[in-house]
């Protein structure tokens, strides 16, 4: 029994001894494995120079720096991408569109002539040099960022004078009208043989031409056809427009003074004429007794017309018959436009009363002087389907000379500041169903005209006046959304007298540096301006056709003043200012006088100012 127990105990001791050594072995193996792993990790870390926990703190910073470098690189490439996109998606299609537009205009012109061949309307439509394709009647400067007045006119450039001048001391050329389409330009002025005040008889010069580029790259206007209408008809206040059939012209036939015409009981005779591409001129009297049955006096606006939707649109103004339907429709209507940062101090009720009275000046016997627009269908038949639009006087001021312009897809009506408001006005115009609608105008506070007191250049309150002078602005600078930003023009920089013509670029409140025609005592009158681009060189030019006096031959000489539009890249911030203020450091660009300087003697200047203020 004892022996058996001993045997069992011995076996148990042996089993326990085996288990103990097995455990020791396992622990030793485990420790060895851990030590091996630790040594391996240390060796690996040492060989790869791995970061310690303190080193890992800088990883986010390093990532941020790398991100900035990548972003910067992408940003620099974005400029290239943007330029490529602009060229491919914007500029190239626009250039193609401009080319297509010019081709279509030429085709349209030819189709008009082909359709009218049986009526001897002529053939062989002219067209400007290819350098001008896409540069006429377009938005020439599209810039959202630059200050408008950082664009400014160069000194006047010598070019071919396409306008005939008087040849005797008593001769007079006055009232220029100009319009240019994508294919040709049209120009007209009045010629009086015995002084500018004669209303009994005159000639009318009418010309058709194209823009050319000389071998040396200079711009010049080439007259292809011209005619001097020297007959028994006394055409006055003519407006001209370039249409697909040639040069359409609207004139009044006058045999009495303007005051006598307003006191008459019947409308003024009017004629629609055309100088065709074959050099032949034809005209037709309009039925004014029906078209202007509510009018006692009616005149074209002098400024150019515009070809829109197969019709030619002319500015018109004149006097309404008292108590006629057109006169009654305007009763009590008025509008007051205000100067920039220069409020009229008069009581509001008094301003309203004076604004209403401004439409019926005493000079014309208290007749309502009304603005209007006449559209005529362009066909081989003259005077076809005329339609008269009379805009409400809640938009327009007292009727006055004007101009209809088309730039890009936008249409405008310029209205001369014959009433109390001195700054230049451009009314946006939309057309539909043969009629026009005018909208609240763009105003250019530094683009003023001289006028008699109380409607001088600095006037700020409504008053009854018939004053001012025709000096139209041309839309030049646009936002990318086609909103007008700035205009070019030649103004008479004097408060009361028609003196000191200067050219400049204008925004709504200020003007650029100026280019002066001559001395401040130089007498001048009407100016009309048109801008275009030589696409080949990407240079923008503006033409101001101006009536300038102080010459040996004739009381007035009509001169085409040509400038290039330059840019002062150092000017970035727009500044408001009165018309007499210029930017610090700027100097007027005064070219060598192209006419004789007047002696600036006190008595001479007094006589000159009185003489200059006497013109209509």
From Swiss-Prot:
Annotated Pfam families: HN
Molecular function GO terms recorded: exo-alpha-sialidase activity; host cell surface receptor binding
Keyword Cell division: no
Keywords: Disulfide bond, Glycoprotein, Hemagglutinin, Host cell membrane, Host membrane, Host-virus interaction, Hydrolase, Membrane, Signal-anchor, Transmembrane, Transmembrane helix, Viral attachment to host cell, Viral envelope protein, Virion, Virus entry into host cell
One Gene Ontology term, aspect cellular component: host cell plasma membrane
Gene3D superfamilies: 2.120.10.10
Chief place of localization: virion
Subcellular location: Virion membrane; Host cell membrane
Spans annotated as Involved in neuraminidase activity: 234-239
Name listed for the protein in its UniProt record: Hemagglutinin-neuraminidase
Species this protein is from: Newcastle disease virus (strain Chicken/Northern Ireland/Ulster/67) (NDV)
Taxonomic path: Viruses, Riboviria, Orthornavirae, Negarnaviricota, Haploviricotina
């Amino acid at each position: 029994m004892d022996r058996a127990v001993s045997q069992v105990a011995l076996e148990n001791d042996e089993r326990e001894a085996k288990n103990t050594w097995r455990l020791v072995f396992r622990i030793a193996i485990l420790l060895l494995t851990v030590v091996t792993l630790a040594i391996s990790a240390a060796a690996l870390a040492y060989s790869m120079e791995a970061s310690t926990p303190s080193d890992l703190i800088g990883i986010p910073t390093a990532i941020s720096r790398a991100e900035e470098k990548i972003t910067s690189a992408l940003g620099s490439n974005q400029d290239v991408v943007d330029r490529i996109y602009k060229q491919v998606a914007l500029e190239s299609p626009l250039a193609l569109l401009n080319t297509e537009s010019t081709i279509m205009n030429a085709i349209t012109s030819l189709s008009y002539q082909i359709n009218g061949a049986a009526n001897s309307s002529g053939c062989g439509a002219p067209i400007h040099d290819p350098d001008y394709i896409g540069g006429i009647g377009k938005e020439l400067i599209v810039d959202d960022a630059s200050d408008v007045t950082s664009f400014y006119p160069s000194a006047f450039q010598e070019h071919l004078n396409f306008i005939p001048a008087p040849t005797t001391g008593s001769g007079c050329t006055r009232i220029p009208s100009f319009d240019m389409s994508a294919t040709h330009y049209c120009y007209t002025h009045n010629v009086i043989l015995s002084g500018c005040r004669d209303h009994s008889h005159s000639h009318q010069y009418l010309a058709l031409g194209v823009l050319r580029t000389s071998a040396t790259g200079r711009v010049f206007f080439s007259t292809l056809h011209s005619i001097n209408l020297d007959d028994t008809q006394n055409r006055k206040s003519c407006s001209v427009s370039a249409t697909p059939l040639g040069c359409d012209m609207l004139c009044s036939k006058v045999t009495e003074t303007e005051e006598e015409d307003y006191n008459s009981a019947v409308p003024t005779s009017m004629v629609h004429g055309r100088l065709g591409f074959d050099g032949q001129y034809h005209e037709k009297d309009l039925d004014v007794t029906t078209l202007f049955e509510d009018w006692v006096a009616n005149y074209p606006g002098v400024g150019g017309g515009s070809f829109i939707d197969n019709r030619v649109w002319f500015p018109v103004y004149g006097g309404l018959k008292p108590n006629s339907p057109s006169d009654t429709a305007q009763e009590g209507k008025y509008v007051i436009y205000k100067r920039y940062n220069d409020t009229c101090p008069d009581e509001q009720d008094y301003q309203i009363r004076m604004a209403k009275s401004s439409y019926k000046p005493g000079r014309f016997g208290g007749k309502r002087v009304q603005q209007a627009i006449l559209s005529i269908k362009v066909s081989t038949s003259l005077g076809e389907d005329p339609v008269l639009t009379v805009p409400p006087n809640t938009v327009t001021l007292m009727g006055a000379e004007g101009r209809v312009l088309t730039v890009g897809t936008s249409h405008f009506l310029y209205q001369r500041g014959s009433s109390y408001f001195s700054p230049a006005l451009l009314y946006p115009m939309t057309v539909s169903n043969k009629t026009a609608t005018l909208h609240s105008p763009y105003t250019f506070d530094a683009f003023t005209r001289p006028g008699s007191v109380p409607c001088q250049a600095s006037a700020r309150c409504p008053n009854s006046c018939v004053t001012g002078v025709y000096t139209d602005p041309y839309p030049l600078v646009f936002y990318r959304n086609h909103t007008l930003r700035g205009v070019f023009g030649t103004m008479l920089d004097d408060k009361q007298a028609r003196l000191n013509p200067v050219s400049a670029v204008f925004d709504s409140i200020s003007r650029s540096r100026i280019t002066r025609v001559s001395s401040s005592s130089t007498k001048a009158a009407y100016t009309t301006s048109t801008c275009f681009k030589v696409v080949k060189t990407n240079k923008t030019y503006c033409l101001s056709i101006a009536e300038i006096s102080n010459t040996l031959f004739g009381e007035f000489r009509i001169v085409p003043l040509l400038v290039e539009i330059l840019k002062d890249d150092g000017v970035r911030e727009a500044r408001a200012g009165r018309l007499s203020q210029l930017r610090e450091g700027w100097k007027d660009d005064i070219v060598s006088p192209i006419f004789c300087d007047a002696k600036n003697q006190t008595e001479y200047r007094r006589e000159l100012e009185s003489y200059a203020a006497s013109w209509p």
